[in-house]
Amino acid sequence: MMEESALLNDHVFSDALEPIVNIPRRTIGSNPQIDPCEMNGQIHFLTTAYFKNTEYERCLGMVKDMANLTGKIVLGSSWELACEYGRGETRSQLLAKKEKLSPTFFATNYESRWVGSSDACIVDVNKMLNLRTLPKAELKSDGKSEYYIGVDVARSTKTNNNQTSIVVGKVKRDKKDKVKHIQIVNIVNLPNGTNFTGQAIAVKRLQKLYNAVSVIIDINGLGVGLLDEVMKLHQDPITGEELIAFDTINTEHESDEAETLRCVWGIQAQGLNTDIIVNFINMVESGGLQLLEKVDQNAIANADSDFLTNRILPHVQTELLIEEVANLSLEQLNGGKLTVKRNSKSIDKDRYSALVYMIWYIMTQQNKSREEEEEFNIASICCFSSPKIR
């Protein structure tokens, strides 16, 4: 009997576990016998739904075998079956819980729905889950570390598809100043319909809180509107403090303000898609990316507003980030270029986009070792001697 079989990949099962149950047990003694009443050779898989993986493919195969009467059977149901028979929580209690829990958590644990992409997923979701090693979010700079901010600007003015996502990353370097880890210490999703002024103020607040080295903004399409806005002087409507105007590092856009902070890198992602995707895949495969730990869902249901916002919400946003990544399939275009496609249009990729923009910038613009930055001195490879006068 395989408990929580969704967590088991098919290679390990075929190599280490399946051979055990294929051999029936025998009695002890000089003439061991097989018990004819014991159900030998049967394998029972018990699991909740999960991200689509090899176990998902096994379930599909078993359903087809059951239809073809090959001796296999698949049973499953959602929370509604238990409610129908009066078991556990009531329908109203579960629907109220659905409003508070992560969509992925509720879909897999209560609705028996497998989530994500099983075909050409951009990265192995199990590897992504293994990156969740950070115990708690950071709500401001620790005073000594190096922070960067990635921003994906809403692509539409529609309220159901108008979320700007902001990802905060902390860089850990090795002895040669090369990037060793990028820790995602906070993720913020702005409310639907927030105008450019509100978005700019939110970005500036976060830049000030973390003393971020750079703010990476996608300036394709509507992103130019946010770029224009962050180059203006603002006053925080909550604290009343002045928020300095930003200026760009790599574009010809210039602020009209006399005093500016040159920290914005404008990225035009359409021409860099392949490099952006490859850098993201490399960070996941190498373990260089680190994410916030999975949060106890009971803590979400029982948390007060302040604790939920400041401590729990970044972990929930990380959960939604993984859901976005699991929903993406990798596609190869003509000429060998890469792009990603959403399998379910109901799941956006705002958090993913903000994350990969930031990773690309850090790995391509901020990843030079000390040796690479040292000035070239021709005297170090050539010998010169002063001429002798005869």
Predicted regions and their residues:
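RNase H-like, metal-dependent nuclease domains and their acidic two-metal-ion catalytic environment used
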Residues: 2-11, 39-64, 85-250, 274, ...
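Short, conserved "post-DEAD/DEAH" coupling segment immediately C-terminal to helicase motif II
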Residues: 10-38
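Short amphipathic C-terminal alpha-helix that caps PH/PH-like domains
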Residues: 17-21, 284, 355-361
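Residue-level signal for alpha-helix termini/capping positions
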Residues: 22-26, 208, 285
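Short mixed-charge
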Residues: 26-36, 236-260
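Short glycine-/polar-rich loops that comprise or flank the Walker A/P-loop
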Residues: 39-42, 70-74
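Conserved AAA+ ATPase "SRH/arginine-finger" region at the nucleotide-binding site
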Residues: 77-82
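Conserved RecA-like P-loop NTPase helicase motor core
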Residues: 260-284
